[in-house]
């Protein structure tokens, strides 16, 4: 996406205190960065998605109401864990961080790092959660390849060690079987 | 060429639960790194390995006939994966199974072996349906 196309790409977040110009700049910046960006109210209801979110997931704010979006978006193996982690952050105000798989519009899953921080008012009450989802599919693949390579290497070393032990054992047996040698 | 197009569709098989019959069949040698292995040995020269029940045939171009011997699947509790015992008149060696990948329909397989000499070999198998 060309940055020049972004000015009116996604709706600006609703913030009655912010000027229209500021809201437009926020939306421009949020659409420019490579992450999916979202904002929720203190109870976890979404109030803003950037254009990348909408383009990747196919869900805009209107479609995000209710449980369907998360049930459809999240990989079935990640849904329970995601609910628990997000629920913990909402209940405690702790920073949110999780790796999970999101389904794209085309039906394929990719790994994302979801992170969010609460924004608080002067009294320390949470007024909103600001979150991003960073595509880590390639890093996950690299990590899995590295883990597989390490596991292979470990197995090879063990295999060669056992082979060497067998050879030493056979050699000792041959020497022991030779008459005149102790 | 069709096989290579499909290689992305091959799935890793858990080597701790690998059925022995997944290793049998007629394998093409796709690639090989000799390392310390004798380059003139039958397995170093082979372009095709037939792992039939109880019988091993190592075929190499330029040789009048395939080297014939036996093979067997071995397991050691210290290793988390099986290894193969190859017995040929000119060569007796073991090879660790480092990876086995198969298509969902079992028609295509890719087998990686690591020999005691350090030789690494990738074998491929395709069973196209007969028309």
Language-model features: where?
Chain A
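PAS-associated C-terminal cap
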Residues: 1-25, 77, 134-148, 153-164, ...
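Per-ARNT-Sim (PAS) sensory domains and their PAS-associated C-terminal
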Residues: 91-94, 98-116, 125-127
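Sensory-domain cores of signal-transduction modules, predominantly PAS/LOV
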Residues: 35-36, 43, 96-99, 156, ...
